Each structure stands twice: as structure tokens, then as C-alpha cells.
């Protein structure tokens, strides 16, 4: 298969006077598994359909390799698309559904047999070749659509929320298979999803979109651990947000922040700040330790606070705690912990709701997500 990268340059698109895409610039490397995520209506599917050739941009360019494909019809773009709906032919069996693109090209029968069997084996359906598609599960039908797309040997495979119609267990299994298939064929995959966990678990890089704009591009770890702004931080998983002012620059790595309702804490300096700057801190629920007894600080950059447990929710592999500060009921924290962490080292009593407790977190676990300098 011929590998192609995608370069999207200054792309804009409006419908009925409403701008859907705003100055989109993206470079997707050949062979990447690249995910585009964002809330409904953010423009991610419009962008995918634009790459496929179903929609034309109002301005800008889309390069497939060195060629600007904006004016090329879909059938000449060397790009295949897999949609949420499988679009299979119910009157054809599995073999003929996968063979259909080759029959359109009038490929000889020997090659068709070799290629269809090759791609059915790739998606694990070689033993189902004579079955009607109606006899197969939703996950199997989606794998047929993947095989049919790949048999065309596209330079880029576009996947428009292909797993959203499946149940959670099947979705997870097919996600793993998609990753293995991508490793096998080595072409560029562009994956559209609203499921953040899907994107985080499978992607080489992720673009986060909102309101027609690309807010951040990075590896899963980069966008999760170092979000560009509060929207990205909030969209990718759960978070706690707090506002305050910089009171002291300790060194190049650490600063003291006076957080509203908490008091002075220590935070890692991920951005340049100066004393007096207003800041927003994000703190992931899984980064916080909850204890029945106050934990003695072993490091001078640990933060702690006394809290009251409002709610406890058991959710299988972890438990979720919702607490508020003892001295400020309006300031609430979400805390997610693995079950081994439910017990205090001293008395091994579980923490439930309607109890006093203590929270601690490392200065390096919080993230300085936004900075607003004081106006002079």
C-alpha cells in the first residue's frame, strides 16, 4: 500500500453563514494513527468528509503527499472511508462484499480470490466468507467494512466514529483489533471519535477540536497531562479546577499559589508566571490521595487539606469520592482511587461518606493550565 501523509493548510468552511471550520492547520504524518476528538458539532466530521472529498473547503488546501487534492473527486483521492453505518450489501455474502471494489476495477478472478482471502484473514473472518452479512454480529460486520476499505490499498483510511454503534465490550475488542490492523498495514489512519478513552488508548497523536478550531495536537500523554487550556483539560477525563494568584516564585520549577478557599499551595511551573498573576490550576482526581488520618509531609512540596466526604461511589476497579473542604463547603474535590488505596496505613479502616478525612497531592501533580497577567 502506498503511504501518504496529510497536510491541511488554512482550511475554512461555512454553512448558511455559520463558520464550521476556522483556519484549520494539521500535519498528519504517513503511517500515523491520528485521532480527532471533540464534542458534537465541533467540526471533526466535516473535516473528515473534506479530506474524503465529499465536502469542499471555502478556502485553504489539503495535501495528500505532495498533491493538493481539493479539486479531486473522492474516487481519485486514494482515500477510503469507513462510516458508523457499515453500508454493506445485504444480498451479497461476506466474500463478495469484500471483493466488490476489485470487481468494479475488473480485476482478474485469481487476484480477487487471493486479495479477498488475505484481507478476510487480516480481520479474522476467513471462515465466514460464504455467510450473508445478516448472519454476523455488528462487530463482524464492521470488520467486513474494514477489509473492503483496505482491499483498495488506500494511502489513507478515514474512520468516522466506526465503533459508536457497538456495545462497550465489543467496542473495546474491536479497538484493539483496529490497532493491530494498523500495525500490520502501516498506512495512515485518521480516526474520528467523541470517546476520549478510545482516542487516548489507540492514537499516536490526537487533535482536540472545539467550535471549529483545533485547540491542541499532541501525544495522548501530552494532551492529558499538559492540556492547552481548561476546555482540553475538562474534555479529556475528569478534573478539579481552582483559581488563585501567584504569591512567590520558589525556583525555576516551583511557585506558591494562593488558591481561593484553600490557601497557599505549591505548584510546578509549566508556564512562565510572575507574582500577582491570576492562574487556573487543574488537578486530576486520580492524582489525589485520600486518608482517614492526616499524613505527615515527607516532602516540602506536598499539599494537604482537611475535607469532609460527601459521597462515595463504588465503580468496579476504582472508587470515587466527592468531598468538600472543612473550612469551605463550596470548594469541592473529586477523588478517584484504586481499591488498595482505600485503607489508611495506620488503622486500615475504609473511608466512607459523611466522614472527616484528609487529602494530599504532590506539587508536580497539579497543572498550571491558564495564566492571566495583571494589567498595569
Curated annotation (Swiss-Prot):
Database matches in PROSITE patterns: ABC_TRANSPORTER_1, ABC_TRANSPORTER_2, POTA
Binding positions for ATP per the UniProt entry: 38-45
CDD domains from the UniProt entry: ABC_PotA_N (cd03300)
Broad class of enzyme this protein falls into: translocase
Membrane topology annotation: Peripheral membrane protein
Any one GO molecular-function label of the UniProt entry: ABC-type putrescine transporter activity
GO CC annotation: ATP-binding cassette (ABC) transporter complex
Function: Part of the ABC transporter complex PotABCD involved in spermidine/putrescine import. Responsible for energy coupling to the transport system.
Descriptive protein name: Spermidine/putrescine import ATP-binding protein PotA
Organism for this UniProt entry: Fusobacterium nucleatum subsp. nucleatum (strain ATCC 25586 / DSM 15643 / BCRC 10681 / CIP 101130 / JCM 8532 / KCTC 2640 / LMG 13131 / VPI 4355)
Organism lineage string: Bacteria, Fusobacteriati, Fusobacteriota, Fusobacteriia, Fusobacteriales
Amino acid at each position: 500500500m502506498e503511504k501518504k501523509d496529510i497536510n491541511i493548510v488554512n482550511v475554512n468552511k461555512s454553512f448558511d453563514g455559520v463558520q464550521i471550520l476556522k483556519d484549520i492547520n494539521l500535519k498528519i504524518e504517513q503511517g500515523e494513527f491520528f485521532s480527532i476528538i471533540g464534542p458534537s458539532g465541533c467540526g471533526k466530521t466535516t473535516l473528515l468528509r473534506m479530506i474524503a472529498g465529499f465536502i469542499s473547503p471555502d478556502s485553504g488546501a489539503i495535501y495528500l503527499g505532495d498533491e493538493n487534492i481539493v479539486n479531486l473527486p473522492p474516487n481519485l483521492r486514494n482515500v477510503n472511508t469507513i462510516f458508523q453505518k457499515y453500508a454493506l450489501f445485504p444480498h451479497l455474502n461476506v466474500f463478495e462484499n469484500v471483493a466488490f471494489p476489485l470487481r468494479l476495477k475488473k480485476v482478474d478472478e485469481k487476484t480477487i480470490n487471493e486479495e479477498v482471502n488475505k484481507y478476510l484473514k487480516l480481520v479474522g473472518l476467513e471462515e465466514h466468507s460464504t455467510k450473508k452479512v445478516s448472519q454476523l454480529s455488528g462487530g463482524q460486520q464492521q470488520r467486513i467494512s474494514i477489509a473492503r476499505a483496505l482491499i483498495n490499498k488506500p494511502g489513507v483510511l478515514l474512520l468516522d466514529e466506526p465503533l459508536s454503534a457497538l456495545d462497550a465490550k465489543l467496542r473495546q475488542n474491536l479497538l484493539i483489533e483496529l490497532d493491530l490492523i494498523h500495525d500490520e498495514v502501516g498506512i495512515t489512519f485518521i480516526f474520528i471519535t467523541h470517546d476520549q478513552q478510545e482516542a487516548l488508548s489507540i492514537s499516536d497523536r490526537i487533535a482536540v477540536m472545539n467550535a471549529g478550531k483545533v485547540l491542541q495536537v499532541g501525544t495522548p500523554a501530552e494532551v492529558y497531562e499538559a492540556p492547552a487550556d481548561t476546555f482540553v483539560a475538562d474534555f479529556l477525563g475528569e478534573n478539579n479546577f481552582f483559581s488563585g494568584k501567584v504569591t512567590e516564585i520558589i525556583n525555576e520549577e516551583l511557585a506558591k499559589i494562593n488558591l481561593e478557599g484553600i490557601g497557599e499551595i505549591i505548584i510546578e511551573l509549566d508556564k512562565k508566571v510572575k507574582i500577582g498573576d491570576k492562574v487556573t490550576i487543574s488537578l486530576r482526581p486520580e492524582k489525589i490521595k485520600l486518608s482517614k488520618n492526616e499524613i505527615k509531609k515527607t516532602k516540602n512540596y506536598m499539599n494537604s487539606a482537611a475535607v469532609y466526604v460527601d459521597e462515595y461511589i463504588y465503580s468496579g476497579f476504582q472508587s470515587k469520592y466527592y468531598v468538600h473542604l472543612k473550612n469551605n463547603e463550596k470548594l469541592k474535590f473529586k477523588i478517584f482511587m484504586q481499591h488498595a488505596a482505600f485503607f489508611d496505613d495506620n488503622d486500615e479502616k475504609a473511608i466512607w461518606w459523611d466522614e472527616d478525612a484528609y487529602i494530599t497531592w504532590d506539587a508536580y501533580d497539579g497543572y498550571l493550565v491558564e495564566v492571566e497577567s495583571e494589567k498595569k
